[in-house]
Amino acid sequence: MHDAPAQRKRRRPGRIGPLPRSSRFARLKLLIASACAALLATLALPPGAAHAQTVTSNQTGNHNGYFYSFWTDAPGTVSATMGSGGNYSTSWRNTGNFVIGKGWSTGGRRTVTYSGSFNPSGNAYLTLYGWSRNPLVEYYIVDNWGTYRPTGTFKGTVTTDGGTYDIYQTTRYNAPSIEGNKTFNQYWSVRQQKRTGGTITTGNHFDAWARAGMQLGSHDYMIMATEGYQSSGSSNITVGGTSGGGGGGGGGGGCTATLSAGERWDDRYNLNVSVSGSSNWTVTMNVPSPATILSTWNITATWPSSQVLVARPNGSGNNFGVTIKHNGNWTWPTVSCSTG
């Protein structure tokens, strides 16, 4: 409730000169006090509050340097607040299904770091979440969950970042996706022991999936997500990270090389390499034995040894590719990039 505004005092007729000195001094003190009060109010705001954005409807966008995605099939039961940098918070009550998070508009081999809190009551996941196209795949690297631990067709395990993850594959039929209602596979890495915070080296999961015959296509978005289903709860997560996680990317000296999957056959596979940060670059690729490189395109290639490729631009742009004969080793090569 607000008090009724006081009536404005009318100015005395005939006064057109300056205010008396005592009145001017009182007015100056009032202005200083008001400025101090405004400053203190600003300082009292929680970090990021001045840049916070509340989201309650399905959308994607960019906020404070990070991509975000908000999707729900039950509007009105979940909301998110986009905080400073990679921070976001969620609150949901008796919801249907939702996925909310911050990350990157284009995923890939990244070393993702995150911290925060995750407090579900019912079925929910705290997960690195993303999509690829051609093939269309929805993937999860699950670090924490509520009452239900996701499962599926067991494909093996991968040990990375201080823990062991079980690998599963499932299929969804005529379900919502980034390409509309489609039938598509889901890939899962589910940590055996829950945690809320740490590092996720995505390339190690991608390599383990590939060894199990679970191939990704070209990356769409990737977010550190909170997902809930017929549950209630809250989360507050801050995400960060760098490109080149695991065996598939590297940077230094002003450029970064990032690997992504190409076509795959029984005995060999293609990798695409994208270079950013410079058009005058040198990429060094180290191939794990006994795998070998069969061919390359869009580069000038030299071979310091049978397991090392040095690639330089040949006028075809900043993207090139290689065909690798795996010889029983499906682990992707590592790459590093330097300018000049």
UniProtKB/Swiss-Prot annotation:
SMART domains: CBD_II (SM00637). Optimum temperature is 60 degrees Celsius. PROSITE patterns: CBM2, GH11_1, GH11_2, GH11_3. Optimum pH is 6-7. Residues 1-52 form the signal peptide. InterPro entries: CBD2 (IPR001919), CBM2/CBM3_carb-bd_dom_sf (IPR008965), CBM2_carb-bd_dom_sf (IPR012291), ConA-like_dom_sf (IPR013320), GH11/12 (IPR013319), GH11_AS_1 (IPR018208), GH11_AS_2 (IPR033119), GH11_dom (IPR033123). Residues 1-20 are annotated as: Disordered. Residues 248-340 form the CBM2 domain. It is found in: Secreted. Is inhibited by Ag(+) and Hg(2+) in vitro. EDTA and other metal cations such as Na(+), K(+), Ca(2+), Cu(2+), Mg(2+), Fe(3+), and Zn(2+) have no effect on catalytic activity. Pathway: Glycan degradation; xylan degradation. Its EC number is 3.2.1.8. Residues 54-239 form the GH11 domain. It catalyses: Endohydrolysis of (1->4)-beta-D-xylosidic linkages in xylans. It is an enzyme of class 3 (hydrolase). The active site is at residues 138, 227. Endo-acting xylanase which specifically cleaves internal linkages on the xylan backbone, releasing xylooligosaccharides. Is able to hydrolyze oat spelt xylan and birchwood xylan, releasing xylobiose and xylotriose as the major products. This is Endo-1,4-beta-xylanase B. The lineage of its organism: Bacteria, Bacillati, Actinomycetota, Actinomycetes, Kitasatosporales. The gene is xynBS9.
